[in-house]
């Protein structure tokens, strides 16, 4: 952000060491700016504490929001108040060292905010477009590395240039009572940084969200089509059913592993089964759903496998005769926190009364899996995340666009933008940090409820709030 383009355009003039505002105007500006700063600080602290105390908010996407809240908190504490001081008294009273430190902090934090938004957009894009491969790589460690990279890169890009430019060129040209970045005295540099720091990221984020929206709509249509197909009569020997399966478990589940359970006489036993089953047809389903395939296996092979695998501490070899083994492979697209990932479960059914018993058990499973599909599921966590991302992207674009439009105009016409308009435009960039926590609360009921519990000091069971 170019926080002193207007001041830079008039830096050659004599600086009046008195406030350009009347006393009543100064009081009004201080009250409004101070209130915005306070709301920004409280709001972003609430975001950070909510993610810390509520385990349902401890997802990869919310860790990115935590990083964004850190940047917004710094803006609320330092940037807003120092810029208010600079505005109301009409000059910079704290000296060149504090000036450069403030500018470095302001630009590093602002750039980190933009990079966090880019990370969030790319993360959601890969979640939606690569649901089978990306969630495996999407770990807390990876998220931490991406967040660290965003902050380190922002620091490298801005801090050294702001702090040491005067030594590189052989002297400081910024007046003592002014505060702006020295290398922004060149309009071409100002124009280029505006393109790189705002317009290019906005274009990338807009394209990504458009792709996310398209992919989400395509998956919804696919899910509806599969749901309609699952209403057809079902044969117990080949079943493909669908259930709505809300999954709030944030612990990553291996997509390669198979859970083996034995169902004997319609009841599940705790024995480990080592035999191999004939793999049935698998059918991918939409988000938060399960595909079920039931395929009867070879009786002779199954009996041989049973003899080799049934081990019990309390029983000798248990021989099951005149029975057939059916393998049901359930392919579930469960959510790893806020991103879909497929998991497999193999259930083995051993019927003691031949085909009739086996078919009865299979029909029960089919009935169990198809019943929840009749109910309208609540909004999935994926939809909440996508909605939150849309809100913060819109807030970012709306609040940052006016200032960056003025930057482009100022590159060609230094006297075309009034000082008051510059100040308002720059303050809008700061207000984005105030709006972000409200976006989280409005788009995510869990954030909203946790905020409420924290503000009302209701700490009991706050960690399990949904």
Curated annotation (Swiss-Prot):
A Pfam family that the UniProt record links to this protein: 7tm_1
Keyword terms of this UniProt record: Cell membrane, Disulfide bond, G-protein coupled receptor, Glycoprotein, Membrane, Phosphoprotein, Postsynaptic cell membrane, Receptor, Synapse, Transducer, Transmembrane, Transmembrane helix
Extracellular-facing ranges: 1-25, 84-100, 166-187, 411-418
Domain of life according to the entry: Eukaryota
Database matches in CDD domains: 7tmA_mAChR_M2
Biased composition (Polar residues): 228-238, 246-256
Cysteines paired by S-S bonds: 99-179, 413-416
Broad class of the protein's primary localization: membrane
Chain positions covered by the region annotation Disordered: 223-265, 279-315
Biased composition (Low complexity): 287-298
Compartment(s) where it occurs, according to its Swiss-Prot or TrEMBL record: Cell membrane; Postsynaptic cell membrane
Residues listed as glycosylation sites in the UniProt record: 2-3, 8
GO molecular function: arrestin family protein binding; G protein-coupled acetylcholine receptor activity
Function as written in the Swiss-Prot or TrEMBL entry: The muscarinic acetylcholine receptor mediates various cellular responses, including inhibition of adenylate cyclase, breakdown of phosphoinositides and modulation of potassium channels through the action of G proteins. Primary transducing effect is adenylate cyclase inhibition. Signaling promotes phospholipase C activity, leading to the release of inositol trisphosphate (IP3); this then triggers calcium ion release into the cytosol.
Note: This receptor has a high affinity for pirenzepine.
Family: Belongs to the G-protein coupled receptor 1 family. Muscarinic acetylcholine receptor subfamily. CHRM2 sub-subfamily.
Name of the molecule in the record: Muscarinic acetylcholine receptor M2
Source organism of this protein record: Gallus gallus (Chicken)
Gene: CHRM2
């Amino acid at each position: 952000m170019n926080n002193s383009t207007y001041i830079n355009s008039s830096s050659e003039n004599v600086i009046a060491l008195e406030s350009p505002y009347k006393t009543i105007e100064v009081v009004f500006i201080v009250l409004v700016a101070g209130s915005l700063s306070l709301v920004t600080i409280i709001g972003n602290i609430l975001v950070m504490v909510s993610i810390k105390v509520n385990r349902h908010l401890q997802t990869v996407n919310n860790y990115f929001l935590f990083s964004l809240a850190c940047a917004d908190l710094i803006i609320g504490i330092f940037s807003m108040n120092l810029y208010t001081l600079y505005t109301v008294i009409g000059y910079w009273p704290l000296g060149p060292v504090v000036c450069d430190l403030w500018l470095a902090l302001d630009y590093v934090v602002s750039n980190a905010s933009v990079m966090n938004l880019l990370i969030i957009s790319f993360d959601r894009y890969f979640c939606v477009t690569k649901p089978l491969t990306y969630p495996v790589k999407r770990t807390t460690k990876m998220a931490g590395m991406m967040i660290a990279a965003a902050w380190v890169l922002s620091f490298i890009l801005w801090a050294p240039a702001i702090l040491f430019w005067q030594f590189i060129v052989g002297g400081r040209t910024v007046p003592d009572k002014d505060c702006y970045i020295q290398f922004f005295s060149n309009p071409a540099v100002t124009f280029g940084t505006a393109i790189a720091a705002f317009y290019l990221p906005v274009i990338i984020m807009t394209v990504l969200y458009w792709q996310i929206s398209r992919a989400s709509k395509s998956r919804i249509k696919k899910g509806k089509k599969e749901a309609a197909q699952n209403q057809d009569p079902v044969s117990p020997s080949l079943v493909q059913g669908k259930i709505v399966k809300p999954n709030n478990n944030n612990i990553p589940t291996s997509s390669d592993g198979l859970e083996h359970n034995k169902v004997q006489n319609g009841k599940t036993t705790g024995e480990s089964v080592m035999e191999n089953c004939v793999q049935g047809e698998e059918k991918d389903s939409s988000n938060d759903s399960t595909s079920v395939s039931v395929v009867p296996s070879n009786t002779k092979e199954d009996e041989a496998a049973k003899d080799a695998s049934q081990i019990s501490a309390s029983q000798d070899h248990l021989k099951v005769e005149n029975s057939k083994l059916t393998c049901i492979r359930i392919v579930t697209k469960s959510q790893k926190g806020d991103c879909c990932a497929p998991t497999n479960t193999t259930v083995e059914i051993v019927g003691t009364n031949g085909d009739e018993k086996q078919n009865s058990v299979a029909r029960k499973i089919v009935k169990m899996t198809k019943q929840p599909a009749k109910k309208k599921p609540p909004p999935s966590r994926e939809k909440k995340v996508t909605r939150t991302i849309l809100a913060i992207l819109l807030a970012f674009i709306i609040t940052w666009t006016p200032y960056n439009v003025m930057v482009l105009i100022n590159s060609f016409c230094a006297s075309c933008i009034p000082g008051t308009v510059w100040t308002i435009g720059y303050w809008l960039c700061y207000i984005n940090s105030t709006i972000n926590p409200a976006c989280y609360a409005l788009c995510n009921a869990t954030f909203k409820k946790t905020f409420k519990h924290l503000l009302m000091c209701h700490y009991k069971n706050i960690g399990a709030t949904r």
